[in-house]
């Protein structure tokens, strides 16, 4: 599931954009902090969950409302990275897409 703070008026445009990036997953449009939305999404979900965001405040919001979720602070924008504050609650801070995938797989293997 992709949870995005994209206005609902452009929801379908975002879905098309994600499909073009080979990310054909359900999209939920959100407003504001994502912690409460993730809590609602996961209320009947028992498997391991991950939350990945480039916004440290969204990572903290999800961490505060969903202690069992593995929170990941990840940005591919080298211009912004040096100025971003540390994300409270982020247990993974990958440095590349490859590093992200490797660390997520590692978490899943640890849960076996």
Q: What is each residue range found by the language model?
A:
Residues 50-93:
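Acidic, Mg2+-coordinating phosphoryl-transfer loop and its flanking beta/alpha structural elements
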Residues 1-15, 27-30:
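Substrate-recognition element of Asp-dependent hydrolases with the DxDx(T/V) motif
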Residues 38-44, 98-111:
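Short amphipathic alpha-helix with an adjacent loop that forms part of the alpha/beta core around
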Residues 10-11, 35-38, 58-60:
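Short, well-ordered alpha-helical microsegments
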Residues 24-25, 29-46:
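Donor nucleotide-activated moiety binding/catalytic core segment of transferases
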């Amino acid at each position: 599931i992709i949870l995005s703070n994209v206005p609902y008026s452009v929801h379908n445009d975002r879905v098309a954009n994600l499909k073009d990036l080979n990310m054909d997953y359900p999209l939920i449009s959100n407003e504001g902090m994502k912690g409460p939305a993730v809590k609602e999404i996961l209320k009947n979900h028992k498997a391991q969950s991950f939350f990945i965001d480039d916004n440290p405040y969204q990572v903290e919001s999800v961490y505060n409302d969903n202690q069992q979720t593995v929170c990941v602070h990840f940005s591919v924008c080298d211009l912004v990275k040096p100025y971003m504050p540390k994300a409270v609650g982020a247990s993974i801070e990958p440095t590349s897409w490859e590093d992200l995938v490797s660390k997520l797989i590692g978490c899943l293997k640890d849960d076996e």
